[in-house]
Structures are given as structure tokens and as C-alpha cells.
């Protein structure tokens, strides 16, 4: 729920860098970047021009060797807090009813065209007047599902942790958004699930 400029601001603290030893010079990052931020030197290794980079992290998601990393450890949690703040700005003082379809849960943000198969089976539809309770219920439902075989987290290479989101992205901190959402008064993580 942010404009293009707003999304750049949300991602701003998460600008990536390249671990040179891991870069194989495949140019995947350059092909997917709409801003021309990745460049290649004589050693054929990528570097990210942070002045051109908008922090969308598409290069991070597509890198086949995980050579591209977030620059700051706190970046994912800061991004999640900013998302909560943008959400509050949109819904504050307005009557809202929120609906989430927990289907085709992909390992990456659904804005990435290179996404993989779903990581868990389809769960269903959830609805609430409280967006925080809704998100918590959806997360709990996803975490209760078995991992899909042949998905990014179903293979033996993924983290074998209980948290499917951390299995897909070990450095993620999805809970920061919900904690911050409660703190700023967006809603409550407590919910009562009524199945219809």
C-alpha cells in the first residue's frame, strides 16, 4: 500500500551489496534491475551502484549464488516496520474490512516475476476488521501447513526450521511488522478464528 516513491522509501535502508567471492558474473542481477544499478568490472564481478539502486531487492532474490546480500542487518525489520506504518496511514480513521486469500504462497514477494512454486498448500480465505489479527491468523495457518515437496523450502537444501518464512529467507523478521503494528495501534495480534 505504497506509491512507487513510497516503496523506494520503504526499501531504502535495505540496499544490497555483492559478496565478491560468491559472484560468478552471470549478469542475472543486471538483467532484472530496471535502474541499471549492478555493474561489472574487469574481474567480471558485480557491484551495486547505491545511487542508482532503489532497494527493491529483485537482484537479491534472483542471484543464483546468494552473492547479493542486504547491506544492514536491521534492514528487513526496518522494512517491515515501515510497511506497518504505511498501512496505518492508509486505514487510520477509515472504515475498513480486510480480506486475505492464503493461496499460492510464494517464497518471494509476489512482485517478483521469477517466483517459484508455492511453499505450502492453499489454505483458504480469511477476513477481519483488524488487519493485524488477520495477518497473525494467516501466518499461523501457513506455519501449520506441511512444506510443499519440490518447493524452495521443501528441498533438503532449505533450513529445516519450523518457520516456513525463515526457511525461505533465514534473515527475515516478519514478526517485527506485527509487533510494531500493535505498538502503533494498528490492531491486535490476538484473534478468534471462526471457520465457515
Regions found by a protein language model. Give the residues of each.
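Extended, low-polarity segments enriched in aliphatic/aromatic residues
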Residues: 1-196
Amino acid at each position: 500500500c505504497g506509491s512507487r516513491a513510497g516503496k523506494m522509501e520503504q526499501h531504502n535502508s535495505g540496499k544490497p551489496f555483492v559478496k565478491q567471492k560468491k559472484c560468478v558474473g552471470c549478469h542475472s542481477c543486471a538483467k532484472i534491475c530496471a535502474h541499471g544499478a549492478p555493474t561489472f568490472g574487469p574481474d567480471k564481478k558485480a557491484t551495486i551502484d547505491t545511487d542508482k539502486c532503489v532497494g527493491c531487492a529483485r537482484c537479491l532474490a534472483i542471484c543464483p549464488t546468494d552473492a547479493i546480500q542486504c547491506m544492514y542487518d536491521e534492514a528487513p525489520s526496518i522494512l517491515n516496520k515501515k510497511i506497518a506504518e504505511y498501512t496505518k496511514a492508509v486505514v487510520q480513521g477509515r472504515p475498513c474490512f480486510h480480506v486475505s486469500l492464503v493461496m499460492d504462497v510464494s517464497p518471494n514477494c509476489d512482485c517478483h516475476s521469477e517466483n517459484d512454486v508455492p511453499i505450502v498448500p492453499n489454505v483458504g480465505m480469511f477476513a477481519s476488521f483488524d488487519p493485524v489479527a488477520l495477518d497473525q491468523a494467516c501466518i499461523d495457518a501457513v506455519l501449520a501447513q506441511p512444506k510443499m515437496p519440490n518447493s524452495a523450502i521443501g528441498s533438503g537444501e532449505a533450513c529445516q526450521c519450523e518457520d516456513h518464512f525463515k526457511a525461505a529467507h533465514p534473515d527475515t523478521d516478519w514478526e517485527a511488522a506485527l509487533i510494531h503494528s500493535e505498538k502503533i495501534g494498528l490492531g491486535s495480534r490476538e484473534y478468534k478464528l471462526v471457520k465457515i
